[in-house]
């Protein structure tokens, strides 16, 4: 009886996850308390490594389960406190609202998005031109919208493309998008090629959000924190960042073209002709049979999308609240009144919202155990002429494994403190702020946990459909990581000081004599 109970418990634990993975998580849970007792600092870094491991195994088991167990143990073992976790969640409330409401809001305008991107996919036959179009559109949108919103759009339209083809070649009347058993064998090769095609477009678009997001005050949450701390407005932020962001943007887009031409790192796969014909046939059929009511729905969704862009660009409300308004308007004017139909919009976002909340527990451990303090102290103790380079590198390394908002906030607070204590000049502080922002945004494309948008893509329902794993995402991001991080570093070292001086001399920027009056944000 006892043996059968133990066997049943073992089977229930983490469900259908492989046995070796279950044993690994159990081993983590057993070892961690002993490491905490010996050295909490080492235990903190071990927790970070273990959490990254759960993310890398996202296709084996959704990271919320094993990551959540590790996070609970971290709180109970004293690595952090429930109060600190609550503080982190409060500090990131806008991000949580964004995930809950904006992603769901995008769900209700997906017909328009699918219509627009289907037209783009059908009309642009060159894979290089199509990849560049996806990257440029993602970069432009993410300069004004949050990267998560942009990635949610790309995920929505990719699922639309995939489901159209998958349903067409399925032999079962009850179509299951997650099951390939119903697909004829002769279609398997085309399906795999189509998956590779979608993966490349997804990665171009995801990296595009980083290219555009670094440029503007509203591009990323940490940009807003850094800009407010420095007392910069929208135009000044763009000008100061341009010494680094523009060369990076140009080189990033060139990398997009080069990868497609050379077909390296999983890029260069073209859409199979059979898939293209099916998508075109589906689009032509939809156009021919679209009713007046359906056309009006598209018009309403277009108007709502205009409101979305205007509301976000002018910061009329928190991003999540604008997303809530999109849900209200879209459901009202497209006739979605059933509770269950509305509920389906939240199935994509809420698991990730819970996972991100678990991630903030890890961030709380990083703060309470001061895991980054040795690196921060090393950077601040370096000679001023080396600080730009070191700030960029230190931010880049840490933002690969931690929350970008947290990393950016920690470093800008330290730089602000140095300014207040007259350790550095105001002009040097402004240069450091640029290095902090670019260092936080650019190298973080290296890993999915470095960019929230990448993590969202990895843990979305689309990832298993197109076989996007943690390792594959890192591999496909590698050329972009090298180019973005490398060009960003060289621009920070050699272009930023001289270009900033030229901006002063040309009257584009004014020297700021006063210390910013913004109180450093606690995070």
Swiss-Prot record:
Q: Look up and give the membrane topology term.
A: Multi-pass membrane protein
Chief location bin:
membrane
State the family named in the UniProt similarity comment for this chain. Answer: Belongs to the NhaB Na(+)/H(+) (TC 2.A.34) antiporter family.
Q: Which reaction is the catalytic activity of this chain?
A: 2 Na(+)(in) + 3 H(+)(out) = 2 Na(+)(out) + 3 H(+)(in)
Q: Where are the bilayer-spanning segments?
A: 28-48, 51-71, 89-109, 137-157, 237-257, 302-322, 347-367, 390-410, 445-465, 476-496
Disulfide partners: none
The Gene Ontology terms for molecular function here are: sodium:proton antiporter activity
The species is Tolumonas auensis (strain DSM 9187 / NBRC 110442 / TA 4)
Known InterPro entries for this protein?
A: Na+/H+_antiporter_NhaB
Query: What is the protein name given in its UniProt record?
Result: Na(+)/H(+) antiporter NhaB
One GO CC term on file: plasma membrane
* Pfam families for this protein: NhaB
Localization in the cell: Cell inner membrane
Q: What does this protein do?
A: Na(+)/H(+) antiporter that extrudes sodium in exchange for external protons.
Which UniProt key words apply to this protein? Antiport, Cell inner membrane, Cell membrane, Ion transport, Membrane, Sodium, Sodium transport, Transmembrane, Transmembrane helix, Transport
């Amino acid at each position: 009886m006892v043996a059968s109970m133990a066997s049943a418990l073992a089977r229930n634990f983490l469900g259908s996850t492989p046995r070796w993975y279950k044993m690994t998580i159990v081993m983590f849970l057993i070892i961690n308390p002993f490491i905490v007792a010996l050295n909490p600092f080492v235990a903190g870094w071990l927790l970070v490594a273990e959490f990254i491991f759960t993310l890398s195994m996202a296709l084996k088991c959704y990271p919320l389960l094993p990551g959540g167990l590790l996070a609970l143990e971290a709180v109970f073992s004293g690595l952090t406190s429930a109060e600190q976790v609550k503080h982190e969640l409060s500090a990131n409330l806008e991000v949580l609202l964004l995930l809950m409401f904006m992603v769901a809001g995008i769900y209700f305008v997906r017909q328009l998005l699918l219509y627009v991107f289907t037209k783009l996919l059908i009309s642009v036959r060159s894979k290089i031109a199509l990849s560049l179009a996806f990257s440029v559109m993602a970069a432009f949108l993410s300069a004004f919208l949050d990267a998560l919103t942009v990635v949610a759009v790309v995920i929505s339209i990719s699922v639309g493309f995939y489901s159209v083809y998958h349903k067409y070649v399925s032999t079962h009347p009850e179509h299951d998008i997650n099951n390939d058993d119903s697909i004829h064998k002769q279609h398997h090769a085309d399906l795999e090629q189509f998956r590779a095609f979608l993966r490349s477009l997804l990665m171009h678009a995801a990296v595009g959000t980083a290219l555009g997001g670094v440029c503007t005050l509203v591009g990323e949450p940490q940009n807003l924190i850094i800009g407010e701390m420095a007392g910069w407005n929208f135009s000044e932020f763009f000008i100061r960042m341009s010494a680094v962001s523009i060369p990076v943007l140009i080189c990033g887009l060139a990398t997009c073209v080069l990868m497609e031409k050379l077909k390296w790192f999983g890029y260069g796969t073209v859409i199979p002709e059979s898939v293209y014909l099916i998508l075109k046939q589906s689009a032509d059929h939809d156009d021919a049979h679209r009713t007046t009511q359906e056309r009006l729905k598209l018009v309403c969704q277009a108007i709502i999308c205009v409101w979305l862009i205007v509301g976000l660009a002018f910061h009329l409300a928190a991003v999540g609240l604008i997303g809530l308004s999109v849900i209200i308007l879209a459901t009202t004017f497209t006739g979605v009144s059933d509770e269950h139909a509305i509920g389906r919009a939240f199935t994509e976002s809420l698991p990730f919202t819970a996972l991100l909340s678990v991630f903030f527990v890890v961030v709380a451990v990083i703060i309470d155990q001061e895991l980054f303090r040795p690196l921060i102290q090393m950077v601040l103790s370096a000679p001023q002429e080396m600080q730009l380079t070191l700030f960029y590198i230190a931010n880049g390394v840490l933002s690969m494994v931690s929350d970008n908002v947290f990393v950016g906030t920690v470093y800008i607070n330290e730089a602000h403190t140095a300014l207040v204590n007259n350790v550095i000049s105001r002009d040097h502080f402004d240069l450091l702020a640029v290095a902090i922002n670019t260092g936080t945004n650019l190298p973080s494309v290296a890993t999915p946990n470095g960019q929230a948008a990448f993590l969202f893509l990895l843990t979305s329902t689309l990832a298993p459909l197109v076989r996007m794993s943690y390792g594959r995402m890192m591999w496909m991001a590698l050329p972009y990581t090298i180019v973005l991080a490398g060009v960003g570093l060289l621009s920070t070292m050699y272009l930023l000081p001289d270009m900033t001086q030229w901006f002063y001399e040309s009257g584009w920027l004014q020297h700021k004599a006063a210390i910013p009056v913004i109180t450093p944000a606690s995070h």
